[in-house]
C-alpha cells in the first residue's frame, strides 16, 4: 500500500506492508508456520513471538513443529499476573523467535532481551518480511542469527525512503 506512513520504529515510509493481511488468512498462516518450522533444529525447545504481530506466527510455527510457544509482551500489564512472558519459559530453553515485519529490529530485540534475561537462549530470529532498513544489521550486531523468509526486494518494492 502506498502513501505516507509512520512505522513502529518511528521512521516514515512511502509504503506500508499490512501484516494483518497475511496473519489473518489461514492458508497463508499455515504456509508461514511451515516456513518457520524449517528453522526449528533439534535443540530448539520453544517458539517465541512478540505481541501483537508475532503471536499468530508463533502459534502457527508451534503447531507445525510440535513445540510449545510463548508470547513476549511489549510491556507489563497492570492486571492479572503482570508477567512479560506468557506461557512457560524456563532457564536453559532454546528459543526460535519469530517476527512479522522487521524494519530496525527494535521490537524483536526487546523480546530477545526479555528471553535472555529469563535465562533462556535465542537460537535465531526469523521474520516474514525484512524491509531492509537496518534490522539485519542491528540483530546480527546484537549477537543473534537472523533470517527473513522474504525481503522487500522479493516483493518488488523499490527504495522510496
Q: Whereabouts are the PLM-identified features?
A:
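Active-site-facing substrate-recognition patch
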Residues: 1-42
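Solvent-exposed alpha-helices and their adjacent loops that cap or buttress functional pockets
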Residues: 40, 87-91, 117-119, 138-139
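Short glycine-rich phosphate-binding loop at a beta-alpha junction
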Residues: 43-53, 124-127
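PRPP-dependent phosphoribosyltransferase catalytic core
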Residues: 114-161
Amino acid at each position: 500500500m502506498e502513501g505516507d506512513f509512520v512505522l513502529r520504529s518511528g521512521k516514515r515510509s512511502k509504503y506500508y506492508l499490512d501484516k494483518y493481511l497475511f496473519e489473518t488468512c489461514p492458508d497463508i498462516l499455515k504456509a508461514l508456520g511451515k516456513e518457520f518450522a524449517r528453522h526449528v533444529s533439534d535443540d530448539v525447545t520453544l517458539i517465541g513471538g512478540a505481541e501483537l504481530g508475532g503471536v499468530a506466527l508463533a502459534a502457527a510455527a508451534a503447531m507445525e513443529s510440535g513445540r510449545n510457544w510463548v508470547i513476549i509482551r511489549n510491556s507489563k500489564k497492570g492486571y492479572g499476573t503482570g508477567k512479560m512472558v506468557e506461557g512457560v519459559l524456563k532457564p536453559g530453553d532454546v528459543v526460535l523467535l519469530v517476527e512479522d515485519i522487521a524494519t530496525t529490529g527494535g521490537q524483536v530485540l526487546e523480546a530477545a532481551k526479555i528471553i535472555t534475561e529469563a535465562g533462556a537462549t535465542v537460537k535465531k530470529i526469523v521474520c516474514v518480511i525484512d524491509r531492509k532498513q537496518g534490522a539485519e544489521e542491528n540483530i546480527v550486531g546484537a549477537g543473534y542469527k537472523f533470517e527473513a523468509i522474504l525481503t522487500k526486494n522479493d516483493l518488488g518494492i523499490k527504495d522510496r525512503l
